[in-house]
């Protein structure tokens, strides 16, 4: 497995390429803002784009999706159904990103973890020792809960679930706010929100509201 992290757009977003090195079959995660930059990375590495994985449906994470659907007609697009209302248009080949489902491309097995909170349909994607957390968990931060479909209570439960991943699991967040990557173990030591979620629901809810 290999990963390319691409910083895109004016909001310090990350889009990702995730691929199986044996077959070069790849997924693009949260394609946004700079479609040509992402396409160049795909071409330079000789990758075969097989799917798009969306952590959630806010525009700053999906606004380059149509470009890749046009380039690859019939491209499977994975999104949790609870976030469909956020999309301006429905993908042509929409697949449900269901909690616990395993998505495969080449030899890659990518597990879907439903992590509502920032949006009702937010998910994280776990591949080997990497977890793509979208706007659920950042380095030193967590997602906002003051937007349509968001819930502080749901985010509390989602962060508690992520904290159960092995400490060596590498976090690949949806934005570069305090750093590009970290691990679950480091964040349990230094991320106030992850700490509060592990200790005090009332304290967590007070901190995020």
Task: Identify the function of each model-found stretch.
Residues 31, 62, 155, 159:
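Aromatic/hydrophobic pocket-lining residues that form the small-molecule binding cavity
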Residues 1-45, 124-134:
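Conserved beta-strand hairpin/beta-sheet module of binuclear metal-dependent hydrolase folds
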Residues 6, 97, 184:
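Hydrophobic residues at beta-strand termini and immediately following loops
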Residues 17, 101-126:
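Core dinuclear metal-dependent hydrolase active-site scaffold
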Residues 114, 119-208:
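Metallo-beta-lactamase
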Residues 12, 23-26, 33-111, 189-192, ...:
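Active-site HxH/HxHxD metal-binding segment of metal-dependent hydrolases
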């Amino acid at each position: 497995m290999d990963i390319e992290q691409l910083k895109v757009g004016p909001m310090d977003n990350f889009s990702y390429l995730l691929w199986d090195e044996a077959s070069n079959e790849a997924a693009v995660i949260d394609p946004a803002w700079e479609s040509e930059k992402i396409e160049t990375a795909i071409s330079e590495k000789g990758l075969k784009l097989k799917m798009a994985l969306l952590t959630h449906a806010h525009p700053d994470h999906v606004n380059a999706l149509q470009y890749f659907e046009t380039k690859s007609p019939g491209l499977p697009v994975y999104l949790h159904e609870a976030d469909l209302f956020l999309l301006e248009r429905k993908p042509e080949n929409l697949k449900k990103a269901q909690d616990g489902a395993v998505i495969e491309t080449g030899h890659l097995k990518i597990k879907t973890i439903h992590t509502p909170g920032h949006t009702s349909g937010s998910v994280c994607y776990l591949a080997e020792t990497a977890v793509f957390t979208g706007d659920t968990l950042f380095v030193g931060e967590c997602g906002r809960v003051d937007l349509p479909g968001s819930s502080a209570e749901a985010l509390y439960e989602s962060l508690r679930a992520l904290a159960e991943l092995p400490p060596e699991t590498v976090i690949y967040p949806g934005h570069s706010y305090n750093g590009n990557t970290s691990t679950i173990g480091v964040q349990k030591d230094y991320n106030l929100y992850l700490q509060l979620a592990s200790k005090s629901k009332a304290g967590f809810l007070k901190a995020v509201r």
